Structures are given as structure tokens and as C-alpha cells.
Amino acid sequence: MKILAIRGKNLASLAGDFEVDFTVEPLKNAGIFAITGSTGSGKSTLLDALCLALFDSTPRMTKARESKVELADVRNKTIAQSDSRSVLRRGTAEGYAEVDFIALTGETYRSTWTACRAGGKPSGILRSVGFRLMNLSKNTEEQGTRKELLAKVSKLIGLSFEQFNRSVLLAQGDFAVDDAALHLAVKVQRIRDISDSVRFFVGVGDQQGVLVQLALCKAQLRKNAAVVQLVP
């Protein structure tokens, strides 16, 4: 699996249309690089767009399910923070997240997540999430329900949402050795799973480092493995 482009519109801190194209310079041959910027500039939102377009969810939304926080919406309604539509920028009527990628089959696909409000107005109630999957190599659209299409995407890229989070996004603090909530056996298995996923993704992903924080991952894995080895 190789990511070719990330696009979106009106998502959280990123207003209007945006695009990151890895098929043109300076990113085409950049190798590993950093996404930097001040707080609120859209770094995390860019990663959210990637996840939404592939999985209709993000790591932050997964964590929000535990807290069950409700956010204020229009017309005195609320929306769960864990709802993927909550990423739609306030004061806008529509938004989308889109990713072009090369699947394990070698074919190029485009997955698109959309959110909109009734009547095309910022004051309209939220409509159901839309999801499309196009086979760009064959110029055909995959058919199925949103759930079926999401399952298709996971199969095409060879990673589930959980595996993607562990081996690609590597959310900060997820592998902390001093996390009391994780038993040693769970830590060991997680290290094995992540290690396998990272080797796999880098191998087929042409070492595209925009999101694969490889150096950080390897350092943390070595640290965790060293701690595990100290246990009789």
C-alpha cells in the first residue's frame, strides 16, 4: 500500500480545500520528512483526513468513545465527540476527506469520506456520512454499503484500523512503558504486532515517511523490548 495524495475540505482547523500530493516534487522524492506547524495549524487534522478517508474514524475519536463527551451543534442539538462528523468545521455546510492510494493488488484507488448539512446550509442538521471507493485503474466505482466499502479498503491496504494506528500513525504515548493499564503480556504482544506491521508497511509503502514515524517507532520498540528482556 502506498499513499499518493491526501485531500480535504472544511475539516476542523483546515478551512476550505487542501491537498498534499506525494506524486509531485518536493514530496515525490523527499523520503522521511516532518509535518510541522504551530498549535491549531492543522497537523493533526491532516492525519484525521487520512484516517477518515480510509476508516471513517480517527484515533482521537476512538479515545473519545470512552469519555462519551457530547459537543454542541446547531438547533440546540448535540453530537458525540466520537462521531466522525464532528470533524466538520464549524460554520460550514459540507466537507470531505479523500485519499488516493496504491493497493496491495497494484491498482490505484480513491476513497472519499463526506459530511454535509441539510439544505447545504451551515445551520442545517447533519446528514449521514457518505463514503465512496473508486478504482482509478479501471475507472469504476466499487458498490456496497458504507460498512462493506470500509471493509474493502482494509483488505486493499492490508491493515485494519487498529493496525494502521499502531504502525502508521503511532499516536503519542500509546507505547509508554510506564502505562500501568497495560500488563506485560499485552505489551509484549503489542510490540510483536507493531514490529511486524511496520516492517510490512515500509516494505510495500516505498518507505514513504510522511506518516510512518519510523525512527520514533524503532526507538520506542527497542526501549520496550529492552524492558521486557529484563523480566525473568
Predicted regions and their residues:
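A short, flexible beta-alpha/helix-coil linker loop
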Residues: K28, D174-F175
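Acidic side chains
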Residues: D21, D48, A180-H183, D193
